[in-house]
Amino acid sequence: MKIITNLNKKHDYQFNVTTSNGFSINCRFKEVENIEYHNDTGMVVTVFNDYKKGIASTNDLSSASIEKTIAKAENISKNTQPDEYQGLPESNVTLSMSKNLGIFYPKDLKTDDMASIAKTCEEEAFNFDKRIVNSEGATFSAANNEHMILNTKEAFGSFKSTDYSLSCITLAEENKLMERDYWYSSARDYNKLETAKQIGIKAAKRTISRLGAKTISTRSCPVIFSPEMASSLIGSFLSAISGPAIYKKSSFLLEKLNQRIFPEFINIKEKPHLADGSGTKPYDCDGVLTIEKDIIQNGTLNTYLLDTYSSRKLNMKCTGNGVITNITMEPDLPCPSNLIETLEDGILITEMMGSGANILTGDYSRGAFGYLIKNGKIEHPVTEITVASNLLKMFENIKSIGNDFDLRNNIRTGSILIDNITIGGTT
């Protein structure tokens, strides 16, 4: 605190401090292949000097190192162009204390025990089917994290979190052709991870299901995006309503505020303080309190996602979105337990390649792997296909959300069924 009191009173300062310690164990063919321990600390110093901004960072939190980092940030600020929208957030929107968020579950874990769990995970995959012929191993990881923020407008906050995960990657072979897939579980609470057996078997099932993939002809048809792929679509939507995309006029959703983007049964909410949420945070990177909000209500876009800078640039209220926290899809219609059974003919997409979402135009084109659906059942896997459409059209054509919600990531959604998408095939 002595360093803080010795700062230049003509400037504003912000300090973001993060610490993380934990380990990762990879096991392959019943042997420990790699163990990594980490104990990381970092500080980012931001200086605002007459609307000029300077940033510097350090991994050394000694007094001497912090003083040097502050001086470096000050020097950088002197050589940047002034920007009237730069500066700390107003003091009335920043936090003074942090709440218990339900994301910190420390546990004393022994590396030998975790190695045994990883070995079991891989072994279950091999035992599931003789066509599982190889593996990239199973990996267990754990981390304890802490974040603190303070600035010279007397804002202060901190929170702790834990992260645990277990994953397995397998390879299957049939008729001299090989396929690769995986499964993983992640949680804030170790006790909420899927079991090693569940993860190993799911990895094996997913890999086996890819064998015998065929090419198909080009067509337009209904498409189901698996929860993992559906979250990617919603991620593109979030990018398009971010402050930078809006003030740079580089979004296909520019001037779409208060207009219907999705069908009326779609609601999308941000829940920053969700217990066990992978994106849970009490404040954003500027120190602004995060708040629950209805981003999409009855299909209508209610708000952009603005940090301090973009809100000033757009002359709009800051929404505390210097970070995206937990996003949840909450449809008003019942969620089918199995969207596949609702389709006479269509495609299930489980993997996409490349970054083919153009946020400026909304044009969407990505390579994909999936499964052909006939009469409510999967007929066979399909490969060498391309998903081509426009994001705005895709959002408008959402027909249903499945109840298979993926709770592992910060974007929580089930499978999404979208009508009339062009699938590019080989003929």
Task: For the regions a language model picked out, list residue spans one by one.
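Active-site bordering "gate/hinge" segments
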Residues: 1-281, 285, 297-300, 325, ...
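Dual-mode signal for accessory low-complexity, basic/Gly-rich regions
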Residues: 98, 256-427
